Every structure is written in C-alpha cells, then in structure tokens.
C-alpha cells in the first residue's frame, strides 16, 4: 500500500492511503457469504437465501463496514510504520484522484508534539513546610469534645449565648410572601457554630425562652438558594427553649470512648498527633507538587494537539454535568455549558500531561513495584485491617494504575526539587489547614 504524509500546519498532518479494490471486494463477498449462512428471511429456509438477495439487502452496509475496517487498519498500520504518534482520531475522506484499480483516501490528523524541557536548574520552586503543634492537638481535642457534648435545659429567664442549643420557630418573608424554606417549627441550632447566617444568630443571641423578635436579614449574593440570593427578608423568630452545652472532661473515659487502646490522655494526644501528621504530610505533598508542576510547565515548550484538548474539555464538561446531577439539579445533562469555560483548564492538563510524560520517559521515573507497594502500605496503615486494604488494591488493575500514577507524580516532584532553585517557607499548622 502506498502512503504519503504531508505536513499541513504545526501538529496537523495529511496522509494519503490507497487500497486495491480487489481486496475490499473480496472481503465484502467473504462477509456476505458468512451472513448468508445465518440470516433468516421470509420465504427461504435458514442458510438457503440466494447470494444476490443477500447482496441486495445487506451489500451496502457490509461494504461500508469493510471500508471502515480496512481504511482504519491501513491508517494505523501506516502510522506505526512511519513512527507517527497520532493524537485523537483521524478525519478520513475519499480522495478525488484514485489510481486505476485502487481507492484513495485522505486522512487528516494530529500528532503529539516534541516536548522541549528547559534547564531545570534555573526553575524556581517555593517549598513549604509545617509541623503539628500542641495547639493544633488541643484544638482537635476540643472538636472531639464538642462532638460528644450533651445538653440540659437552662432556666426560663436565662439568655441565649454562644454554645447554647436553641429551639425556635421562624418565618421569613420577601416582599410579603413566605419563601421556600423560609418557615420552620421546633428548629434547633447551636448559637455561634455558624450553622445559621450571622444576622440570624445575632438576632437570637440574648433572647430568652418565650420571647419573639422581628428583624431583617440580607442573603449573600452567592447564597446557595438562588431564589433568595442577594435579597433581604423580614423574619419573625420565637425562641422556645435554651439548652446549655456540657463538654466531657479530657480524661481516660474520653480516650476510651474514642477507641484509644490504653485509654489514656497521653494515648489520645499521640493518636491525634499521628492523624494530624498524616494530614499535614498529604497537604504539603499536594502543595509542593503543585509548585513543581507550575515550574515544570513554565520550562517547557510545546504545541498542544487540538484533539487532546477537545477530549479533555469533553471530560471536564461530563464531570461538571455529573456533579450537577449528583446535587439534584434538574435536567443537568441539558444544562448549557460554554466550552470556553473549560478550555484553559483543559489546555493546562494536556500540557502538563505531555511534559510529565516526557520527563518520565527521558529520566526513567516510572513507578517501580517496590514504590507502589510502599505507597499502598502507607495508605493501608490508617485502617483497622491493613492487610485487607492491601489485598483490595492489588485485586484491581485500575486501582493499581491509580497508585502508580501517584507514585510517578511523586517521582517527578522529587526529581525537579533535586535540580531546581528551591526556597523554603515555613507555614503554621493553621495557615496550612486554611489553604485549599
């Protein structure tokens, strides 16, 4: 089969393919004969339908099928022989000029780019660090105590204050009409916990049981309830009950209730520190990995295949629709989504993927079985039965592939950090936790 390849622009190529007519017709006849042995048609016994009838009924569709198969096979064989790395699917059309006895086709497609990565020793990366402090452990202990707090009714003349659980009836109106979700009876919340909007909490703070109050509340413009977002409502609230919170003591009983094996405060704090350290490590890795990837992309020169970018745009759009559907949005699959919204993120993902792949290939940064095992062991260590978790990962190739991808990213991160100009920046525990 004769093949010619023409460069159209940047990554776009045009390949002209020729197929002997005899090969196509021979395959068409072969498939029609196989079909004739199995099809059932009125007026004929099974397997006894005349070939001319079979050809008349199915000839066009079989010919179309054969052409697709043969041209596709010819294209990818030719691309492999020419050592072309094809990005996406080719656009194939019949050529106007066909040699006698042959059919010619033009395939227009893109190839993956040659990736040029600059001198990584000049790349600048800010590497952050953070430690688990006693203050962070104290705050976690307080959170655990709050999760196990109990409540008792306060005296009738007591005023609601932060930490109290209050029971209220309320009714909110916009332009004189009660809005959806604007009315409730025997509704409970903790004053000061941030469950309610600030103005609502301020209105109930200081009220006593049996008191009623009217007030105005402005909903934020980005409020999740779109019908009331950015609008001001008139509220009437009646406070029916106030309950004081009682936190458990920090002692062996609390430790035991939290599953600490030795049921001691020291054991509880050690367990909290271990869990917080795991979270700190994960966040530092993610942040530093992001900084490395930003630096890596900045040092690379390459053109992006439009086919790859479009495929990534489609994936992002599908993910966005799935998220809307999961949140109960009606007709999420029909929601208008301009592609331009997703294109910058898609381009970055494709660019980063190509750059990382080149760095891995040229520096042998593939994941080793030992690295994969070590990573899975680290993941499994936080579970009650690590051996079961290990088996769960190794029982599925897709899960293993996900771990391998993470290990490769870690290898790339360590490789770049070893060569780049790295500046260290220490963050407090709270600063690290506050960042997304």
Swiss-Prot record:
One Gene Ontology term from the biological process aspect of the record: 'de novo' cotranslational protein folding
PANTHER family listed in its UniProt record: TRIGGER FACTOR CHAPERONE AND PEPTIDYL-PROLYL CIS/TRANS ISOMERASE (PTHR30560), TRIGGER FACTOR-LIKE PROTEIN TIG, CHLOROPLASTIC (PTHR30560:SF3)
Keywords: Cell cycle, Cell division, Chaperone, Cytoplasm, Isomerase, Rotamase
Gene Ontology CC: cytoplasm
Enzyme Commission code: 5.2.1.8
Origin species: Albidiferax ferrireducens (strain ATCC BAA-621 / DSM 15236 / T118) (Rhodoferax ferrireducens)
The protein's name in its UniProt record: Trigger factor
Top-level EC class as recorded in UniProt: isomerase
Subcellular location, principal: cytoplasm
Catalytic reaction equation(s): [protein]-peptidylproline (omega=180) = [protein]-peptidylproline (omega=0)
Domain named PPIase FKBP-type: residues: 163-248
Matches recorded under Pfam families: FKBP_C, Trigger_C, Trigger_N
Underlying gene: tig
This protein's domain notes: Consists of 3 domains; the N-terminus binds the ribosome, the middle domain has PPIase activity, while the C-terminus has intrinsic chaperone activity on its own.
Database matches in InterPro entries: PPIase_dom_sf, PPIase_FKBP_dom, Trig_fac, Trigger_fac_C, Trigger_fac_C_sf, Trigger_fac_ribosome-bd_bac, Trigger_fac_ribosome-bd_sf, Trigger_fact/SurA_dom_sf
Cellular location(s): Cytoplasm
């Amino acid at each position: 089969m004769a093949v010619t390849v023409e460069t159209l622009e940047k990554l776009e190529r045009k390949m002209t393919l020729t197929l002997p007519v005899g090969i196509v017709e021979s395959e068409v006849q072969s498939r029609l004969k196989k079909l004739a042995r199995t099809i059932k048609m009125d007026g004929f016994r099974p397997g006894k339908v005349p070939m001319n009838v079979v050809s008349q009924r199915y000839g066009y569709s079989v010919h179309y099928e054969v052409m697709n198969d043969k041209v596709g096979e010819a294209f990818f064989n030719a691309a492999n022989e020419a050592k072309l790395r094809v990005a996406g699917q080719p656009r194939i059309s019949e050529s106007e000029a066909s040699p006698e006895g042959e059919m010619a086709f033009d395939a227009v497609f893109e190839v993956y780019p040659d990736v040029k990565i600059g001198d990584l020793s000049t790349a600048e990366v800010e590497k952050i660090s953070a430690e688990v402090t006693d203050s962070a452990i104290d705050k976690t202990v307080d959170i655990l105590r709050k999760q196990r707090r109990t409540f008792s009714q306060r005296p009738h003349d007591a005023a609601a204050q932060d930490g109290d659980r209050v029971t209220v009836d309320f009714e909110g109106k916009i332009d004189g009409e009660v809005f959806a979700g604007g009315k409730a009876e025997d509704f409970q919340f903790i004053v000061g916990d941030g469950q309610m909007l600030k103005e609502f909490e301020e209105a109930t703070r200081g009220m006593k049981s049996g008191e009623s109050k009217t007030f105005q509340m402005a909903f934020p413009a980005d409020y999740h309830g779109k019908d009331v977002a950015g609008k001001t409502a008139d509220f009437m609230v009646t406070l029916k009950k106030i309950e004081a919170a009682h936190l458990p003591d920090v002692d062996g009983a609390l430790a035991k209730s939290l599953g600490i094996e030795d049921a001691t405060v020291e054991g509880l704090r050690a367990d909290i520190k271990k869990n917080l350290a795991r979270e700190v490590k994960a966040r530092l890795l993610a942040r530093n990995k992001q900084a490395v990837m930003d630096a890596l992309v900045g040092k690379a020169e390459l053109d992006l295949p439009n086919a790859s970018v479009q495929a990534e745009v489609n994936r992002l759009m599908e993910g966005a629709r799935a998220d809307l559907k999961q949140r109960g949005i009606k007709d999420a699959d029909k929601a208008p989504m301009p592609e331009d919204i997703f294109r910058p993120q898609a381009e970055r993902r494709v660019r980063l993927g190509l750059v990382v792949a080149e760095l891995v290939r040229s520096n042998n940064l593939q994941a080793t079985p030992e690295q994969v095992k070590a990573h899975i062991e680290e993941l499994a260590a936080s579970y009650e039965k690590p051996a079961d978790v290990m088996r769960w990962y190794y029982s599925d190739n897709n899960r293993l592939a996900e771990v391998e991808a993470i290990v490769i990213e870690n290898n790339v991160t360590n490789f770049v950090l070893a060569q780049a100009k790295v500046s260290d920046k220490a963050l407090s525990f709270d600063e690290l936790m506050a960042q997304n």
